[in-house]
Amino acid sequence: CTTEDQFTQSFILPYLLPMLENAGANVFTPRERDTQKQEVIVDNDGSLSGHGGQGSLYLDVKSRKARWEQTSRPGFAQRKRIYQDNENPFLSGTARFAKTEKKKDKAFAEWVPDIPETGEYAVYVSYQTLPGSVSDAKYLVFHNGGVTEFKVNQQIGSGTWGYLGTFTFDKGRNDYGMVVLSNESKEKGVVCADAVRFGGGMGNIARGGQTSGLPRYLEGARYFAQWAGMPYPVYGGYEGKNDMNDDINVRSRTVNYLAGKSLFNPTEEGLGIPFEMSMALHSDAGFSKEDEIIGTLGIYTTNFNNGKLHAGTDRHASRDLSDILLTQLQRDIRSTFNVDWTRRSLWNRNYSETRLPAVPSTIVELLSHQNFADMRLGHDPNFKFTVGRALYKAILQYICSQHGRDYVVQPLPVSHFAIRFGQKKNTLELSWQGEEDPLEPTAKPREYIVYTRIGRGGFDNGVRVSSPSHTVKIEPGIVYSF
């Protein structure tokens, strides 16, 4: 037995998202992706008194040529602990901007969180798109594993949370746990600084006079959309009278708003993020009295908007996407688990999540969560890995086919990992074997990245090596993880 929205998260969050992002994709989820219950927001407008992270620090430092000023557009501010319907925190505060410079170590903004407990926290940044915003705003995340650099295109994605990554931070306020935005850029223009959020947190949207009392990642998309600054028509089409229908529709409308004015949704207003496709992973109801596998169903919609998507593409592109996904899932599950996994059908039906998106979209009804034969595999982490990899490969195939490009599938995880003391003093010899994938001829390992963690810290940014072995220097008495 399982709850559908939590069960499908167990495929998406630990498996599919990392696979897509490791392959270079930019991914958005309409529900909170971080399972961390704690949340700290550091903002130029200050922290809410008595709220988590009240010891956090924001500061901005000017240079000789660039100083920080307040933007003319509103920014984020957390003025309340609990938000009512149609209250937008991204219209409650201010944001800061500075002119760019080509030299390093000039003007910068700094967000230092007061972390309530040691652990892993997703890091989200926010900013306003301004005249002259650059496409290479330089963010540095200082975490327990070191420093990780990101370049963010501030010409798109204004006034919402932009996910950078998930990192380990120690409890308290530390100079090795913070986010820095530099005004260094190859482009002449401005960078903008607004709130930075650490951790997924607890739900803070009140319905019926109270909040859910649940971590935000367990809540519906309607409530996350409000916290993420979406306009009311995106998440409140039923004006607070039918949250279930709003929760279904907001998933598509959020994609449309984020992609509005981009190449893939040029006809709608929005934030200009070029999302190319949308996939909803569901589990289905129903059971077999004969204890047979029910299997996977694909859903798409062609009979809408005169058969066209918003970029003018034929809506049968959604059928292509659905077909590729079902074909890959059936092939990989059958080959890996030696079961007669069923490809049920491709439905051309009128569903919100396949009708409303401006881009090619599909629903994958993976299996029946009421059917024992399906759920014998459903909770197996090896099955979840196989499903995640099949979905990743299908999406890769679809995107590359749309662009007329060849694709290479990322290799499988290594095996036979071993650690031995090195020939030189205070060294370790790491060795492993690259895994060939019998299902994917392109998935051949050519290079590897070795990540190191010292003590109970976080993993570093890794070292790329060309052979299945690596020598590392160590200090006696310290625990190392790889």
Predicted stretch roles:
Residues 471-482:
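Beta-strand-rich modules
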Residues 1, 215-319, 347-370:
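Active-site microenvironments of hydrolase-like enzyme catalytic domains
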